[in-house]
């Protein structure tokens, strides 16, 4: 549905709005990266299993484990220790995830009022965090031991933040005015 909405409506409206001469200049979604940090995994190897499975069910794709690049004694982390998991979504899985995120997970998020425009990075990419991964319907609340957050990065082909914001607004992303 999201992909069809983009092809049918959004491309035409963005092309007219920004006066592009070619359809290929219209910004599009490139990928969505989801990261779940698991600090407990540095000391307990089995602590990564549950978040790994949860991220797998949320994304619909097998995550990759992430490891510490260097040792940090304050966090009791050694170089090479498992510190989380991540997944990169492209094409159809990306659109399916964003649809579930916007219409199901974000409305269920506690105290969510919308995204800030300041969350753009200056190059047309958008990053935000979710405090509770149980907002997704794929997670069974009774089977989890700890509520975890996740970071979501949306990478677009937009040149500026203004173009990326218009693309995400057309996809029904909830922004609040600053």
Swiss-Prot record:
Q: Example GO biological process term?
A: translation
Q: Enumerate the UniProt keywords alphabetically.
A: Ribonucleoprotein, Ribosomal protein, RNA-binding, rRNA-binding, tRNA-binding
Name a Pfam family for this protein: Ribosomal_L5_C
Q: Cellular component per GO?
A: ribonucleoprotein complex; ribosome
Q: Which GO-annotated molecular functions does the record name? A: rRNA binding; structural constituent of ribosome; tRNA binding
This chain's function reads: This is one of the proteins that bind and probably mediate the attachment of the 5S RNA into the large ribosomal subunit, where it forms part of the central protuberance. In the 70S ribosome it contacts protein S13 of the 30S subunit (bridge B1b), connecting the 2 subunits; this bridge is implicated in subunit movement. Contacts the P site tRNA; the 5S rRNA and some of its associated proteins might help stabilize positioning of ribosome-bound tRNAs.
Kindly give the NCBIfam families that the UniProt entry links to this protein.
PRK00010.1 (NF000585)
Describe the protein's quaternary organization and the partners it interacts with.
Part of the 50S ribosomal subunit; part of the 5S rRNA/L5/L18/L25 subcomplex. Contacts the 5S rRNA and the P site tRNA. Forms a bridge to the 30S subunit in the 70S ribosome.
Family according to the record: Belongs to the universal ribosomal protein uL5 family.
What's the protein called, per UniProt? Large ribosomal subunit protein uL5
Whichever gene encodes this chain, its name is rplE
